[in-house]
Amino acid sequence: MGDKGEKESPKKGKGKRDLDDLKKEVAMTEHKMSIEEVCRKYNTDCVQGLTHSKAQEILARDGPNALTPPPTTPEWVKFCRQLFGGFSILLWIGAILCFLAYGIQAGTEDEPSNDNLYLGIVLAAVVIITGCFSYYQEAKSSKIMESFKNMVPQQALVIREGEKMQLNAEEVVVGDLVEVKGGDRVPADLRIISAHGCKVDNSSLTGESEPQTRSPDCTHDNPLETRNITFFSTNCVEGTARGVVIATGDRTVMGRIATLASGLEVGKTPIAVEIEHFIQLITGVAVFLGISFFVLSLILGYTWLEAVIFLIGIIVANVPEGLLATVTVCLTLTAKRMARKNCLVKNLEAVETLGSTSTICSDKTGTLTQNRMTVAHMWFDNQIHEADTTEDQSGTSFDKSSATWVALSHIAGLCNRAVFKGGQENVPILKRDVAGDASESALLKCIELSSGSVKVMRERNKKVAEIPFNSTNKYQLSIHETEDPNDNRYLLVMKGAPERILDRCSTILLQGKEQPLDEEMKEAFQNAYLELGGLGERVLGFCHFYLPEEQYPKGFAFDCDDVNFATDNLCFVGLMSMIDPPRAAVPDAVGKCRSAGIKVIMVTGDHPITAKAIAKGVGIISEGNETVEDIAARLNIPVSQVNPRDAKACVIHGTDLKDMSSEQIDEILQNHTEIVFARTSPQQKLIIVEGCQRQGAIVAVTGDGVNDSPALKKADIGVAMGIRGSDVSKQAADMILLDDNFASIVTGVEEGRLIFDNLKKSIAYTLTSNIPEITPFLLFIMANIPLPLGTITILCIDLGTDMVPAISLAYEAAESDIMKRQPRNPRSDKLVNERLISMAYGQIGMIQALGGFFSYFVILAENGFLPSCLVGIRLSWDDRTINDLEDSYGQQWTYEQRKVVEFTCHTAFFVSIVVVQWADLIICKTRRNSVFQQGMKNKILIFGLFEETALAAFLSYCPGMDVALRMYPLKPSWWFCAFPYSFLIFVYDEIRKLILRRNPGGWVEKETYY
């Protein structure tokens, strides 16, 4: 792809510009306008809605409220690509030349031989079968838009001319007045004008798992975070709301993400690039040799027809016909193996991409963490207690004997609206489903585990009044009867933002006794609050108060709207803090990535402090590495005075990222080894991925929301979450983690590296036999000897004996250094490099050719033709009219007899290639280790050795083969001609690998380590 900058077509330029516009943050101003201004802007009435005629006009202008599907490639085009791409073209040319040669022969001779006809048919069949196979494997296409379609709401409740009406969502237009209620999907982007207890689930868009409250007030400059906008295709969870439509179809926020995901040019996968490079290389060699010898044979005086037949022979000998099938089978096998390890690979070539990954951008919630809020710490009796956050409750426990803890657990259980869903008595507490928000269910599970049934506690302390949590007073309060029948006081319990709770208290509970809340205790509270907050935890304060019986007698009517009871001078009990804890297997996985040279970057929408705490917990920021803020705190200097290059780690806030240029982003990615991006938006995730790719990294990205789909699509490999992932993210991804676990990615990396190694080995094995296939033709033309190996016999090797052994190398186990190497550099570290070619063609291949020729000369000599009399004999040998050709001993040979000897030589040459390929298969098992270290555990490979030998014997001895393939039975002794050469190959390569291991980086490694 040259630089098409100047000649860029207007369409291409426009496409590029649109994408850049999409990458910018969502630009909206409606949330900052008053309701009247919004209605004026869209010419609508906030009570009556639009008129029918106006709505029709707008619908005609803007088009339906639907997403446009992306352009797709027709299936027949894809099929043709498989049939006419790469090697296939060469083989087609070969097949056409065969038919051509047969045609010429049929026209000029009385009894044309059918060789060329059969060969042409076989070549065409090979191409069609491998083409169908590859097409079948690749028959998954961009289904991104289809999953977006499922997300589009079907019906909408619209108010027009003051009447409520149900419309198809596609007919909703800008300016329409729309109502949504709990359970509805939002039909377009709305500016809320009135709401009652409305909450929406924006997780598919922003990744925030908590339902977000919606109200008419502008609460944030960023339209994605403000409360008065709801977005197309998010879900309304509870309550009702009414709003004015401000965008429809592709112009909605969700529509822009859809366009962004389908509009991204997806680059070729690294393995596709490698295979293409390899095909060009081999094709180049084949065409060059074919044409050179075509010209040479014409100069040497052969006829056109003979020259064409040579050309076909050389092309057939040069092209590894079975190779593309081998590659596809290798990738399919690995994909199956990964599916067993919870990685579902959608795009076969992505398997290898994962192996060359050098940067992983991972989500935090649910990928690195368990995706369940859990109580992590408590502060009571003036000390911090640690709770157990492990998935299987194998961690620490704390002292539950204090009376303060009893009071604290009471408040946490009673001042809590979360309940376990029914019918889960036999399910472990941590696995139970809860109705209620994340923090409350964390408290519920914690109390249930440590203090027994919360349900019983609530039955004994009947609730008589409650003020639910709201954002203005930031607390939740309830009033209960006490369980002691002799105590007629009411118990008031309250939880909320710690500083707000503390302000309402005048005493504090220590060891179960109330003490006055003095400055010293306030400072202790402040320190505990800061410490827990600094761990990235979400802290809540708890207090209680027994209402005096004389003021609040039994049956007192508590009024929660116009509060008629005491809500200050309460007694502070303690703090509890919650966090979504890291998954158990993640720190180990991050460590493995580090030793494999892979940089792990955390990208999250969460708060920087929480993000940093989790990053330290899982080892993304390793012990002893500091951020700029840490250095500033340690040296007691302002952050601006610290040189950013001194800090190995850094935490970048989304708002800062928004204002950075590409150069600044590159600077960060180059200078810091451990990076956390917090509070990022989906567009920023895409910018981070592109930044890493500018550095030349191969990037894997994990994501689960719709918001992640552009980044998943842009990354070299997108990894979606199987359990929590939205449909859209699964469609955009190349791979799905069925258990949502980061550790599975590392398994994937190992498998990806293994497949690359094994493909190299497979190709090295397959290419080596090209030399003993080509050299017979060269000598046939140059030295004028009878043909040592026929074209049909070559196909028997490439599509017969070599297939199973080549595929068996895909089952080879990893060598010991696989996860200790740096990721491969796609620019310099090719699948097929000069060293592999020099080993296969220049060294091992040459020894194999010698073995073949040795068998050939032995058989002819045994029949009376010594090597000395063979040179220059070809013209008389192939002449049908000469039936009295003399050998070295003066015996006369007819044409038919000569041909039987020649075909026996073909068979012997074929068998000797099989024998030397035994050794080649065994040495290809390893690239660096000795075969004795690696062992012979690969059962498929052992089967391959036996299978190719059995096939060779079958082709040689089966009756009728002399007619079908011109294979003749051999004397047993002729099988042994190639044995010494096979042994030589094995010894030669073991010595080479020994030198390799003894002198790493030495001359032998530079020249021969592929």
UniProtKB/Swiss-Prot annotation:
Which residues take part in binding Mg(2+)? Answer: 704, 708
Which topology term describes how it sits in the membrane? Answer: Multi-pass membrane protein
Q: Where are the transmembrane segments?
A: 75-95, 119-139, 276-295, 308-325, 760-779, 790-810, 831-853, 906-925, 939-957, 973-993
On the Extracellular side, which residues? 96-118, 296-307, 780-789, 854-905, 958-972
**Reaction(s) this enzyme catalyzes, per UniProt:** K(+)(out) + Na(+)(in) + ATP + H2O = K(+)(in) + Na(+)(out) + ADP + phosphate + H(+)
EC number(s) of the enzyme? 7.2.2.13
Keyword Mitochondrion on this protein?
no
User: Can you name this protein?
Assistant: Sodium/potassium-transporting ATPase subunit alpha-3
Which positions carry Phosphoserine?
A: 930
The UniProt record lists the keyword Disulfide bond: no
Give one Pfam hit by family name: Cation_ATPase
In this entry, the parts of the chain located on the Cytoplasmic side of the membrane are 1-74, 140-275, 326-759, 811-830, 926-938, 994-1010
Disulphides: none
Provide the gene name from the record. Answer: ATP1A3
Q: Which family does it belong to?
A: Belongs to the cation transport ATPase (P-type) (TC 3.A.3) family. Type IIC subfamily.
The segments labelled Interaction with phosphoinositide-3 kinase in the record are: 69-71
Write out the GO cellular component annotations: endoplasmic reticulum; Golgi apparatus; plasma membrane; synapse
Q: Which residues form the active site?
A: 363 (4-aspartylphosphate intermediate)
Q: Which GO terms describe its molecular function?
A: ATP binding; ATP hydrolysis activity; metal ion binding; P-type sodium:potassium-exchanging transporter activity
Q: What species is given as this protein's source?
A: Gallus gallus (Chicken)
Q: What does this protein do?
A: This is the catalytic component of the active enzyme, which catalyzes the hydrolysis of ATP coupled with the exchange of sodium and potassium ions across the plasma membrane. This action creates the electrochemical gradient of sodium and potassium ions, providing the energy for active transport of various nutrients.
Q: Which SUPFAM superfamilies match?
A: Calcium ATPase, transduction domain A, Calcium ATPase, transmembrane domain M, HAD-like, Metal cation-transporting ATPase, ATP-binding domain N
**What compartments host this protein?**
Cell membrane
Top-level division of the source organism's lineage:
Eukaryota
Ranked from the top, the taxonomy reads: Eukaryota, Metazoa, Chordata, Craniata, Vertebrata
> Segment Disordered: which positions?
1-21
UniProt keyword list: ATP-binding, Cell membrane, Ion transport, Magnesium, Membrane, Metal-binding, Nucleotide-binding, Phosphoprotein, Potassium, Potassium transport, Sodium, Sodium transport, Sodium/potassium transport, Translocase, Transmembrane, Transmembrane helix, Transport
